[in-house]
Amino acid sequence: FYVSLLTDNSYPQALHADSQEKESNVQHIEEAQVNQVSSSDKPILLVVEDNPDICDYIAESFSDHFEVKTAANGKLGKESALKEIPDIIVSDIMMPVMDGNEMCRELKKDVRTSHIPIILLTAKDSLRDKEEGYQVGADSYLTKPFSASLLHSRIENLLQSRRNLANHFSANAAISNKAAVITESLNKLDNEFIHKINQLIEERLSSDKIDISYLSDKMCMSNSTLYRKMKALTGLSTNEYVRKIRMKHAEQYLLEGKYNISEIAFKVGINNLFYFRQCFKEEFGYIPSEYLKRLKETGEK
């Protein structure tokens, strides 16, 4: 009998399902791990206040738009912040056990929580008190008494600034441009954090084993803590960020013109050519060959 083989048929859907399924499974695992920390899709607001009336007032005012967590002093607030990794913290200053300034100082020097915006509340309005708050890393200051609308504006402004930074990460800007924005927008600890993450990825760029478990182990964080920090800083999950770094380097290799597509895919840790083309197209809008063609056409005009 005779067997006919179609030499030009790669059956991409059949051959490459494993790579896509693997990444999809990793993404689901990542999301499941962070859901163990937060049971809601709402951003988390941590209120640290020893006055029950003020605490209840803030919680009730923001419960429609935030998952509100509360703590009665700075020590409990710090513990809650490390557990929940909230999106923003509103804290009184004068509290028993640990005051708001000390809690702020402790959280801002811990890489797990250094990115979290903190608004300090105080009954004092002196310049010295405000200077002390900013010296320990507070992002904003609000004098009591205050209205819920004013607090809402402060919270929204801080979160919008963080979203703007995350949007810049998500955009298709050059890595060098991103680095400049990072340096200008983040505190020293968060700059070092992003630099370390990039270093860990780039050191093993050709490996397909870089995922949230590998990075969280190297950063000495739980998977959920790393996920929430990466999401807050970049707007991307950890594995999405890894893929974006791979694609940015793939673009650089492509523009150098020294390697063919298969070699580039291997150099950035993707051993499946079909999946590599798919990722590249998702990042830049075109598969690699079309991307080069478009660039050449643009340069000739």
Enumerate the predicted regions with their spans.
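Acidic, metal-coordinating helix/loop segments flanking the phosphotransfer/catalytic sites
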Residues: 70-88
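Terminal helix-turn-helix DNA-binding modules in bacterial transcription factors
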Residues: 232-271, 294-301
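Basic/polar phosphate-binding segments, predominantly the helix-turn-helix DNA-binding elements
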Residues: 212-241, 265-290
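Receiver (REC) domain active-site loop signature in two-component systems and cognate sites
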Residues: 95
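C-terminal output helix
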Residues: 146-155, 159, 167
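C-terminal end segment of the histidine kinase catalytic
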Residues: 1-32, 163-169, 298-301
